[in-house]
């Protein structure tokens, strides 16, 4: 096997290689990691499942160009430094969520409070996406919300936190469950 065709990520939880179809991150892990940017060489990855309370310090979530990815499930309280409503409300928003160019991605689920202190949410060129679920207080502090490259509309954007108008636009496109108060 050519070294250029086989790559891997090794950590205390195991190995993810270029032939993995599923990546399961156990609850409470990877809390010292400052970003999650999955490399394009994980070209066979079909499913990403992140357990509760993971990536507590991560300020970047980026998935770009994973051609086989079909499903992303992120459980509650992930990618958020603060863990309760009062702290999230008062925390500076400084994280970035980006998911782009995953032509087979159909399902994205984010659990309660995940990404609560992120400032940017972008979904680009995800033509197969039909289910988007955002749990309670997800992306609560997010002033930049962008959805582009979906059919039949080519560009849907909201530049403030989710509003009823954004929810109406999104419900035409996919099933969206939001519980922002």
Residue ranges and their predicted role:
Residues 1-51:
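N-terminal segments that cap or nucleate solenoid repeat domains
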Residues 83-84:
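A short, polar/proline- and glycine-enriched secondary-structure boundary/capping micro-motif
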Residues 25-31, 49-57, 65-68, 73-80, ...:
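Concave beta-strand-loop units of leucine-rich repeat
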Residues 10-16, 35-41, 61-64, 88, ...:
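Leucine-rich repeat
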Residues 170-173:
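Intrinsic disorder/low-complexity segments
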């Amino acid at each position: 096997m050519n070294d250029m065709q086989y790559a891997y990520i090794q950590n205390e939880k195991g190995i993810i290689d270029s032939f993995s179809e599923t990546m399961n991150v156990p609850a409470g892990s990877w809390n010292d990691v400052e970003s999650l940017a999955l490399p394009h060489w994980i070209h066979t990855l079909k499913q990403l499942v992140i357990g509760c309370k993971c990536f507590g310090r991560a300020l970047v979530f980026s998935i770009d160009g994973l051609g086989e990815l079909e499903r992303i499930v992120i459980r509650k309280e992930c990618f958020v430094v603060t863990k309760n409503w009062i702290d999230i409300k008062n925390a500076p928003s400084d994280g970035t969520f980006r998911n782009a160019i995953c032509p087979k991605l159909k399902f994205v689920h984010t659990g309660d409070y995940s990404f609560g202190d992120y400032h940017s949410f972008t979904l680009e060129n995800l033509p197969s996406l039909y289910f988007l679920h955002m749990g309670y207080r997800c992306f609560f502090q997010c002033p930049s919300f962008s959805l582009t490259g979906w059919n039949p509309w080519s560009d849907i954007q909201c530049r403030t936190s989710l509003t009823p108008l954004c929810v109406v636009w999104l419900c035409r496109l996919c099933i969206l469950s939001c519980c922002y108060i």
